[in-house]
C-alpha cells in the first residue's frame, strides 16, 4: 500500500509528540512549583516555550489511514466515513448494519 504524504507527516508528528511529551510535562510541573526560585522557574518556562511546534498535541490531526482524508473520520476504526460505508456494504466490518427508519 502506498504511503500518503499527509499520513507520513502526521505519523512523524505523533512520534515527535510521543518523544517530547514526558519531558514537556516535567518542565511544566517544575515551572509551576512555587518552592523553586523565580530564576529556575523562568528557565523551565523557556524550555517549554522553546520546544518544537510539531511536538504539540494540537498539531496532531486524525486522518484516514487509507486515504489521508482529514474530515469525517470514524475514530474507532481510524478510517473516513466514505471508506467505512464501503466496507460496511461489503460486509467487512462485523456487527454494523445499515440503519433504516
From Swiss-Prot:
GO MF entries: structural constituent of ribosome
Major subcellular location class: mitochondrion
Biological-process GO terms, alphabetical: translation
Pfam family membership, one: Ribosomal_S14
Annotated SUPFAM superfamilies: Glucocorticoid receptor-like (DNA-binding domain)
Gene3D superfamilies reported for this sequence: 1.10.287.1480
InterPro entries attached to this UniProt entry: Ribosomal_uS14 (IPR001209)
Keywords, alphabetical: Mitochondrion, Ribonucleoprotein, Ribosomal protein
Cellular compartments per GO CC: mitochondrial small ribosomal subunit
Compartments (UniProt record): Mitochondrion
Record-stated family: Belongs to the universal ribosomal protein uS14 family.
Assembly and binders: Component of the mitochondrial ribosome small subunit (28S) which comprises a 12S rRNA and about 30 distinct proteins. Interacts with LIAT1.
Protein name per Swiss-Prot or TrEMBL: Small ribosomal subunit protein uS14m
Amino acid at each position: 500500500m502506498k504511503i500518503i504524504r499527509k499520513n507520513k507527516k502526521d505519523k512523524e508528528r505523533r512520534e515527535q509528540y510521543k518523544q517530547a511529551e514526558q519531558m514537556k510535562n516535567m518542565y511544566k510541573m517544575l515551572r509551576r512549583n512555587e518552592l523553586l526560585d523565580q530564576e529556575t522557574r523562568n528557565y523551565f518556562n523557556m524550555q517549554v516555550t522553546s520546544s518544537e511546534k510539531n511536538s504539540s498535541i494540537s498539531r496532531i490531526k486524525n486522518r484516514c489511514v487509507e486515504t489521508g482524508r482529514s474530515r469525517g473520520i470514524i475514530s474507532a476504526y481510524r478510517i473516513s466515513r466514505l471508506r467505512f460505508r464501503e466496507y460496511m456494504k461489503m460486509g467487512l466490518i462485523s456487527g454494523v448494519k445499515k440503519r433504516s427508519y
